[in-house]
Regions:
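Metal-dependent nuclease catalytic cores that hydrolyze phosphodiester bonds in DNA/RNA
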Residues: 1-143
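Mg2+/Mn2+-dependent nuclease catalytic core
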Residues: 124-247
């Protein structure tokens, strides 16, 4: 739960997704893994956090270098050539170290970022969203932090990016949760961050221990559909908080 400076309460995007997910596949996996399930989940969480931290460090370091270079030349915007220089410079610096369980995943994200990123508009940005005409005595909407808003070399416009790690290829159900997560973040940006000018689409980059990542794209209209999907899940989640509460406009 997140409370903003005015006292409004927002529930976590990831918690809402968990509470409204179809957990049959997860329960089957837990039954199959037995006592190892908890350990495997903990390892996966740790490696994901560390791999995320590494790519976040790359982007923030590149931003500092690019902004400093642009300011020193009196430029209002960062040219793509300057960003390319800054990103390469960031890769020559020493990033946070990764342990053996996460080094392959971190390298996978590093390589994708270096190959595709042409600029950034935001990194680890917190969003909140209150659906139109929504009222509830229990919460005011949802909140979360998206990984990055990036300009990409091979696609026009600004893209909402989410980093994931996985030892195995993800099934359709879990991918659907990832897409709905992007939809939730998209809604918050549209509501509170008009300077980002809307997204051309979204992309989920799932790092693997070895080899290239699994990359899944959502075009602009598909991202809007996923925003609607998450809004419906949020309404279902709120109804579960109290069956008798009012959710007008949902």
């Amino acid at each position: 739960v997140y409370r903003n400076s005015t006292g409004k309460i927002f529930h976590s995007v990831t918690h809402i997704l968990k509470e409204t997910a179809d957990n049959d596949a997860l329960e089957r996996w837990k039954a199959r893994m037995g006592d190892r399930a908890g350990v495997l989940s903990s390892v996966a969480t740790t490696r994901g956090t560390r791999a995320h931290g590494r790519v976040e460090w790359r982007l923030k370091t590149a931003r500092k270098l690019a902004v400093h270079a642009a300011n020193s030349r009196g430029l209002e915007r960062i040219p793509s050539s300057m960003w390319n220089w800054a990103l390469k410079k960031a890769y020559q610096s020493k990033p946070p170290k990764l342990d053996l369980s996460s080094v392959g995943y971190g390298r996978c994200l590093d390589e994708w970022l270096e190959r595709h990123c042409a600029g950034e508009a935001a990194v680890e940005l917190r969003i909140t969203c209150t659906p139109q005409n929504f009222t509830s005595p229990y919460c005011d909407g949802w909140a979360g932090t998206f990984d990055a808003a990036l300009y990409l070399r091979d696609r026009p416009g600004l893209w909402l990016v989410d980093w994931k790690t996985s030892a195995n290829r993800r099934g359709a159900e879990l991918l659907s949760d990832y897409f709905d997560q992007l939809g939730a973040y998209n809604a918050g940006v549209l509501q509170h961050n008009p300077e980002l000018e809307g997204f051309a689409g979204g992309v989920v980059v799932i790092a693997r221990r070895a080899g290239p990542p699994d990359v899944h794209w959502l075009e602009r209209d598909q991202l809007a559909e996923r925003t609607a999907c998450f809004t419906a899940r949020f309404a279902r989640y709120v109804r579960g908080l109290c069956p008798f509460m009012t959710t007008q406009g949902m």
